[in-house]
Amino acid sequence: MNFVGPAELTRLLLPDLAREQSAQVVLVISGLALAPKRSSPVYCASKPALRSFAKSLRAQVQEAGWPVLIQEGLQLLVDTDTTRGRGKGKISEAAAASQILDGVAKGRAAIDVGATALLRLILRLSPGLGERIMIGR
């Protein structure tokens, strides 16, 4: 469901979207696509799969000349029903949605929500440290 559902829905909608003057697909992906956590190996494995799907699909859509923008909203630490009572420093669902919509409006391919930009920076500067931080969650 974490990978197959969004990928299959996108596949089914893409032919119709390609016939529009312009269209967007925004795949909301956990920041765990960048580095996994210890407690959820299967869940964490599905996140890079969805991110890879988005990147490959973006290249295919561009090559085909379709007017469809494929975007990724990568988010960490969002306060949802699933995460209530766990972790600190979470942003609200409304703040996450606002950041994604801002990135959509700016046409960004990858939209970093909340602490995701910080995680990217840590992973760029010290991949081992970033993974140790995340795997301990």
Predicted regions located by residue number:
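Active-site helix of classical SDR
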Residues: 10, 46
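A short helix-coil junction within the Rossmann-fold of NAD(P)-dependent oxidoreductases
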Residues: 12-21
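Residue(s) in the substrate-gating loop at a strand-loop-helix junction
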Residues: 30
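Active-site-adjacent segment of SDR/Rossmann-fold oxidoreductases
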Residues: 35, 56-68
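Flexible, glycine-rich beta-alpha linker
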Residues: 35, 68-87
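Active-site loop immediately N-terminal to the catalytic Tyr-X3-Lys motif
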Residues: 37-42
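C-terminal helical subdomain
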Residues: 72-73, 84-124
